[in-house]
Amino acid sequence: MLKVRSALSLIQSQKATLSLATQKRWQTNVATAEAREDSEWLQAKPFEQIPRLNMWALSMKMSMPGGKYKNMELMEMFEAMRQDYGDIFFMPGIMGNPPFLSTHNPQDFEVVFRNEGVWPNRPGNYTLLYHREEYRKDFYQGVMGVIPTQGKPWGDFRTVVNPVLMQPKNVRLYYKKMSQVNQEFVQRILELRDPDTLEAPDDFIDTINRWTLESVSVVALDKQLGLLKNSNKESEALKLFHYLDEFFIVSIDLEMKPSPWRYIKTPKLKRLMRALDGIQEVTLAYVDEAIERLDKEAKEGVVRPENEQSVLEKLLKVDRKVATVMAMDMLMAGVDTTSSTFTALLLCLAKNPEKQARLREEVMKVLPNKNSEFTEASMKNVPYLRACIKESQRLHPLIVGNARVLARDAVLSGYRVPAGTYVNIVPLNALTRDEYFPQASEFLPERWLRSPKDSESKCPANELKSTNPFVFLPFGFGPRMCVGKRIVEMELELGTARLIRNFNVEFNYPTENAFRSALINLPNIPLKFKFIDLPN
C-alpha cells in the first residue's frame, strides 16, 4: 500500500514538473531568499564586477567564419575562455539558453555544492525536457524521469528509484548476467581481431558500445539484446543502438551551441525528436515484453523472493510509467558514457604496461582461470582495479564539468553571487595540475590507494593524493549524484577484469586527440588495440 501511495504521489508531482518558463520564475524567487549581511558577503566584490563576455561578440566567436571558438571542441573552448577571461567569468545567454557563471577555481566548487539546496537544480537537457513535456506529453503525462527535471518533481522521482538502484544488494543480482555478457565480449574480440596482427578493427568502438548497451540492458530492460552476436543485425536492439548514438551526436549542437530551436523547429531538432521517439518506442516494447513474461510467471505460480527480483520488476511494481522512463534514462545515460570511460581506461593500461601487469596480479586472484566466475566476496578485494578506473577518469574526464543553480547567496572567487545564478563548475585545468594532483600528468593509480598505516581511512593517505576532494567528482555530488553509479562501477570492474585476465592489451599508436567533445567526451581515433592471448 505504501508503494502505491508513493507511486501516486510521484505521478502527481511529476505532472506538475516545471515548464521552461516556470523554472525561470522559480529561479527568480530563489534569488530573493535569505539575503546575507555577514562580513564575508559585505567585503566581497559586487557581482557586476565579474569579467563578462559580450553576447554578440561571443556569438560571433562561436558561430561566424573565422570566429576564435567556432571550430574548437567543447573542452578546448572552455580552456580558451579561461585563458582569455580568467578563472571566473559570466557568459550571456544566447538564443534562449540561460546566462551562467563559469568558475575554474577549485576553491569555489565546494561552495557551490554546499549551496545547492534540498533539491539541487542542474541546468541542461532542455531538448529532452521539451520532448517529454511538450512534444510527447501525451505519453509521458508529467512523468519526466531524473535527467531533465528539477525541484520537487525530481526529488520525488529519485525518492522512488533510489532504494532500487542505489542498494548494493540489488546490483549484486547481476554478477552472473554481466559475466555472461563479458564472456560474449571476449569471444567477439577473438572473432574480430586480425589473425596476424591481433589488432582490433578501426571501428572497435562499435563493439565497445554494443558491450556497454548489452550490459546496461541487463539491468534496465532485464534482458540480453544479443548485440554481440552476428545474428541480430536487423534487430530492434540494433535500432536502439543507433537511436542512442544519434541522440548524443545531435544533442551537442542544440544544447551547447547557438541554435534557434526554441523559436523554430530546426532540422536538427526534428532529427533529435525522431531519435528520442525511437528510444521511447523500442524501450516501451521491451518493457511490455518483460510485463508479459512476469504475468506468465505469475499465472504459472512462479514466486521469487524480493531479494531475487530484478530492478525492472521492482520498478514495475511501483508504476509502469516510472519503470519505462527510468529504463530510458538508464539507457541514455549509461551507454556512451561507460564506453568512453572504458576506452580511456584501456588506453591508460595499454600505454602503462607495468600498471597493467600489477592489475593483472590482482585480477588473477579473482579469476584464477579465464572462465572463472565472479563472486561478491572476491570482488570486494580489488582496490587496484578501482584505483585504475579512478585514475583514468581523472586523466580523461567524461564531461566539461558540472552545473548547479545556487539556492543561496554565495561568495565565489571573492565576488558576491546571488541565489538563482546558474554556475558551471569546470575542473578540467585543475585535474592535470600538480598543485592538486602531484605528478598530475602521469597515470598513477597508486594515488587512490589507502596506505597500510591508514587502512581505516576513507581517503587516500599518501603523497600522491588529491589536495582538494571537490576537484574530482566523476559521478557528481550530493543528492544529484549519478543514480546509476553502482551499476556503472560494477560494469567497468567486471568488464576490465575479464579482459585483463584474457589478454595482454597493447596500443601501438599515438593517443593525442584521442577524444572529442560532444555532450560527453567520445573516442576520436581508431581503437586498434592489440589483444594478445594469455595462458589459461
From Swiss-Prot:
GO MF, any single term: iron ion binding
Family matches, as CDD domains: CYP24A1-like
Record-listed heme binding positions: 482
Localization per record: Mitochondrion membrane
Tissue: Expression in third-instar larvae is detected in the midgut and Malpighian tubules of both lufenuron-resistant and wild-type strains, higher expression level is seen in lufenuron-resistant strains.
Enzyme Commission number, as recorded: 1.14.-.-
Cofactor dependence: heme
PROSITE patterns with a match to the protein in the record: CYTOCHROME_P450
GO CC entries: mitochondrial membrane; mitochondrion
Recorded family membership: Belongs to the cytochrome P450 family.
Note: Bari1 transposable element insertion in the 3' end of the gene leads to ten-fold more abundant expression than in flies lacking the insert.
Name the record gives this protein: Probable cytochrome P450 12a4, mitochondrial
Gene giving rise to this polypeptide: Cyp12a4
